Amino acid sequence: HGIEVEEERVAEASVELPNIVQAYGEALPYPDDHFDLVFSNEVIEHVDDDRRTAAEMVRVTRPGGIIVAFAPNRLYPFETHGAYFGGRYVFGNIPLVNWLPDPLRDRFAPHVRAYTMKGIERLFVGQPVRLVHHRVIYPGFDNISARHARLGSLLRRALYLAEHTPLHVFGLSHFIVLRVREDAAG
Protein backbone atom coordinates (compact mmCIF):
# COMPACT_ATOMS: atom_id res chain seq x y z
CA HIS A 1 0.00 0.00 0.00
CA GLY A 2 1.09 3.54 -0.62
CA ILE A 3 -0.20 7.05 -1.18
CA GLU A 4 0.70 9.77 -3.65
CA VAL A 5 -0.86 13.21 -4.03
CA GLU A 6 -0.45 13.50 -7.81
CA GLU A 7 -2.95 11.52 -9.90
CA GLU A 8 -0.51 11.01 -12.81
CA ARG A 9 2.08 9.48 -10.50
CA VAL A 10 -0.55 7.15 -9.02
CA ALA A 11 -1.37 5.97 -12.55
CA GLU A 12 2.33 5.39 -13.33
CA ALA A 13 2.99 3.52 -10.09
CA SER A 14 -0.20 1.46 -10.34
CA VAL A 15 1.14 -0.33 -13.41
CA GLU A 16 3.53 -2.25 -11.13
CA LEU A 17 2.02 -1.61 -7.69
CA PRO A 18 -1.75 -2.13 -7.49
CA ASN A 19 -2.30 -0.67 -4.01
CA ILE A 20 -1.20 2.93 -4.63
CA VAL A 21 -3.96 5.47 -4.03
CA GLN A 22 -4.28 9.21 -4.39
CA ALA A 23 -4.47 10.74 -0.93
CA TYR A 24 -2.95 13.29 1.40
CA GLY A 25 -0.98 12.45 4.53
CA GLU A 26 -3.42 14.44 6.65
CA ALA A 27 -6.32 12.14 5.66
CA LEU A 28 -5.12 8.60 5.05
CA PRO A 29 -7.82 6.47 3.37
CA TYR A 30 -7.39 3.47 5.66
CA PRO A 31 -9.25 2.28 8.75
CA ASP A 32 -7.85 2.60 12.26
CA ASP A 33 -5.22 0.04 13.31
CA HIS A 34 -4.80 -1.23 9.73
CA PHE A 35 -1.03 -1.66 9.28
CA ASP A 36 1.74 -3.43 11.19
CA LEU A 37 4.27 -0.98 9.73
CA VAL A 38 3.94 2.57 8.40
CA PHE A 39 6.93 3.94 6.48
CA SER A 40 7.43 7.58 5.51
CA ASN A 41 10.57 8.49 3.57
CA GLU A 42 11.22 12.25 3.40
CA VAL A 43 7.53 13.13 3.00
CA ILE A 44 6.32 14.79 6.21
CA GLU A 45 8.29 17.97 5.47
CA HIS A 46 6.13 18.58 2.37
CA VAL A 47 2.61 18.22 3.78
CA ASP A 48 0.45 21.17 4.79
CA ASP A 49 -0.06 19.93 8.37
CA ASP A 50 2.79 17.79 9.66
CA ARG A 51 1.24 17.22 13.11
CA ARG A 52 -1.98 15.96 11.52
CA THR A 53 0.02 13.71 9.22
CA ALA A 54 1.92 12.28 12.22
CA ALA A 55 -1.42 11.64 13.97
CA GLU A 56 -2.73 9.86 10.87
CA MET A 57 0.36 7.65 10.76
CA VAL A 58 -0.35 6.64 14.35
CA ARG A 59 -4.07 6.15 13.70
CA VAL A 60 -3.57 3.64 10.88
CA THR A 61 -0.84 1.68 12.73
CA ARG A 62 -2.11 -1.20 14.85
CA PRO A 63 -1.29 -1.30 18.58
CA GLY A 64 2.21 -2.71 18.89
CA GLY A 65 2.95 -1.71 15.29
CA ILE A 66 5.92 0.32 14.11
CA ILE A 67 6.27 3.71 12.42
CA VAL A 68 9.53 4.42 10.58
CA ALA A 69 10.10 7.93 9.28
CA PHE A 70 12.89 9.88 7.66
CA ALA A 71 12.79 13.69 7.61
CA PRO A 72 15.29 16.47 6.82
CA ASN A 73 17.64 17.62 9.55
CA ARG A 74 17.70 21.35 10.27
CA LEU A 75 21.43 21.20 11.10
CA TYR A 76 22.45 19.66 7.77
CA PRO A 77 24.53 22.38 6.07
CA PHE A 78 22.53 22.23 2.81
CA GLU A 79 18.88 22.70 1.95
CA THR A 80 18.41 19.77 -0.43
CA HIS A 81 15.03 20.90 -1.79
CA GLY A 82 16.33 24.06 -3.44
CA ALA A 83 15.48 27.61 -2.45
CA TYR A 84 13.90 30.82 -3.70
CA PHE A 85 16.03 33.87 -4.41
CA GLY A 86 14.24 37.03 -5.51
CA GLY A 87 11.13 35.01 -6.34
CA ARG A 88 13.08 32.61 -8.56
CA TYR A 89 13.41 28.94 -7.58
CA VAL A 90 16.94 27.52 -7.66
CA PHE A 91 17.12 23.72 -7.70
CA GLY A 92 19.85 21.87 -5.85
CA ASN A 93 21.72 21.73 -2.57
CA ILE A 94 21.80 25.29 -1.28
CA PRO A 95 24.36 25.88 1.50
CA LEU A 96 23.51 27.29 4.93
CA VAL A 97 19.80 28.03 4.31
CA ASN A 98 18.81 25.68 7.14
CA TRP A 99 21.09 27.51 9.56
CA LEU A 100 19.25 30.81 9.15
CA PRO A 101 16.75 32.02 11.78
CA ASP A 102 13.24 30.67 11.10
CA PRO A 103 11.77 33.82 9.49
CA LEU A 104 14.65 34.06 7.00
CA ARG A 105 14.83 30.33 6.33
CA ASP A 106 11.10 30.26 5.65
CA ARG A 107 11.48 33.03 3.05
CA PHE A 108 14.12 31.06 1.16
CA ALA A 109 12.49 27.64 1.58
CA PRO A 110 8.75 28.14 2.13
CA HIS A 111 7.94 24.91 0.31
CA VAL A 112 9.57 22.52 2.79
CA ARG A 113 10.37 22.06 6.48
CA ALA A 114 13.55 20.86 8.15
CA TYR A 115 13.45 19.55 11.71
CA THR A 116 15.57 19.72 14.82
CA MET A 117 15.88 16.61 16.99
CA LYS A 118 13.21 17.91 19.35
CA GLY A 119 11.09 19.26 16.49
CA ILE A 120 10.60 15.92 14.75
CA GLU A 121 9.82 14.20 18.07
CA ARG A 122 7.41 17.01 18.98
CA LEU A 123 5.17 16.00 16.05
CA PHE A 124 4.23 12.87 17.99
CA VAL A 125 3.68 14.47 21.43
CA GLY A 126 0.28 13.46 22.79
CA GLN A 127 0.15 10.41 20.52
CA PRO A 128 0.07 6.88 21.98
CA VAL A 129 3.59 6.04 20.86
CA ARG A 130 6.95 5.20 22.40
CA LEU A 131 10.17 6.40 20.81
CA VAL A 132 12.24 3.31 20.00
CA HIS A 133 15.12 4.89 18.08
CA HIS A 134 16.15 8.31 16.82
CA ARG A 135 19.40 9.05 15.02
CA VAL A 136 20.54 11.56 12.47
CA ILE A 137 22.11 9.86 9.46
CA TYR A 138 24.34 11.00 6.62
CA PRO A 139 23.55 10.49 2.93
CA GLY A 140 24.85 7.58 0.88
CA PHE A 141 26.30 9.83 -1.84
CA ASP A 142 24.93 7.54 -4.57
CA ASN A 143 24.99 10.24 -7.26
CA ILE A 144 28.60 11.14 -6.52
CA SER A 145 29.56 7.46 -6.33
CA ALA A 146 28.02 6.80 -9.75
CA ARG A 147 30.24 9.47 -11.34
CA HIS A 148 33.31 9.31 -9.10
CA ALA A 149 33.48 5.95 -7.33
CA ARG A 150 36.53 6.70 -5.16
CA LEU A 151 35.27 10.09 -4.01
CA GLY A 152 31.82 8.67 -3.25
CA SER A 153 33.34 5.80 -1.32
CA LEU A 154 35.59 8.15 0.66
CA LEU A 155 32.71 10.49 1.55
CA ARG A 156 30.48 7.59 2.50
CA ARG A 157 33.08 5.95 4.76
CA ALA A 158 34.09 9.21 6.45
CA LEU A 159 30.58 10.43 7.14
CA TYR A 160 29.23 7.04 8.18
CA LEU A 161 31.97 7.11 10.82
CA ALA A 162 30.76 10.59 11.84
CA GLU A 163 27.34 9.08 12.60
CA HIS A 164 28.95 7.54 15.69
CA THR A 165 30.46 10.79 16.96
CA PRO A 166 29.03 14.10 18.19
CA LEU A 167 29.14 15.19 14.52
CA HIS A 168 26.09 13.00 13.84
CA VAL A 169 23.92 16.05 14.61
CA PHE A 170 24.91 17.52 11.21
CA GLY A 171 23.64 14.54 9.19
CA LEU A 172 21.16 14.74 6.34
CA SER A 173 18.08 13.11 7.83
CA HIS A 174 16.36 12.12 11.01
CA PHE A 175 15.75 8.38 11.22
CA ILE A 176 13.00 7.85 13.76
CA VAL A 177 11.30 4.63 14.86
CA LEU A 178 8.20 4.65 17.06
CA ARG A 179 6.06 1.85 18.46
CA VAL A 180 2.33 2.39 18.90
CA ARG A 181 1.37 1.49 22.46
CA GLU A 182 -0.49 -1.80 22.93
CA ASP A 183 -3.31 0.00 24.78
CA ALA A 184 -3.86 2.42 21.87
CA ALA A 185 -6.59 0.65 19.92
CA GLY A 186 -8.38 3.18 17.74
Explain the meaning of each model-derived region.
Residues D48-E56, I66-R179:
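S-adenosyl-L-methionine-dependent methyltransferase catalytic module, highlighting the catalytic core
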Residues V180-G186:
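Generic C-terminal helix-cap and adjacent flexible tail
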